[in-house]
Amino acid sequence: MTRKPVHLALYDTWADWETGHATAHLALAGHEVRTATPGGRPVTSMGGLRALPDLALEELRPEDSSLLILPGAAAWDEGDDLAPAARTARAFLDAGVPVAAICGATAGLAREGLLDDRAHTSAAAPYLAATGYAGADRYVEADAVTDGALVTAGPTEPVAFAREILTLLGAYDDKAVDAWYRLFHDSDPAAFAEWTQAAGR
């Protein structure tokens, strides 16, 4: 059976440091990573990186994907321009296709009502509370949280975010993911050999 691609949503001001660990190590595991932007237009990250997408976000369908990744962006907190991305996340979750959101994207999901009944985390509880959402009692103080098909994380936790994604998609076995996390998060030198051996590299 052909593996469906992972889709990374990009938009102007996206936080380019938040998804690199996840996309790089998904690609190393054989997953195709495709990018989608509003209107299929080129976009520019916070760091000034310009991206040409593979497709328009509006064309993206859950049945054609194995995961939707939503990075943070200043634009999540500057109006409703990214509300369509949150609605796309709703379509994915309704179809049982995983969604992974980090930083400001979690606020977008909160506004869409997608965190009201799911365990989640973000930059801080007050940040999400400011959206007026109804899920404050499901907030978890953790580096990253997976609840069913939804992964959430705060902006300082791109490695934990990637760990949850790699685990959710079964990109590597648990031993390999544990070694990978200790290498990239804890800077454990012993983990390098464990990671390369466990991952078959």
What positions do the PLM features span?
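Active-site-adjacent pocket-lining segments in enzyme domains
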Residues: T2-W14, A24-P38, D54-A100, G104-R201
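Short active-site-proximal "capping" loops at secondary-structure junctions
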Residues: G39-V43
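Short N-terminal binding/cap micro-motifs at the start of the first secondary-structure element
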Residues: W14-T19, T44
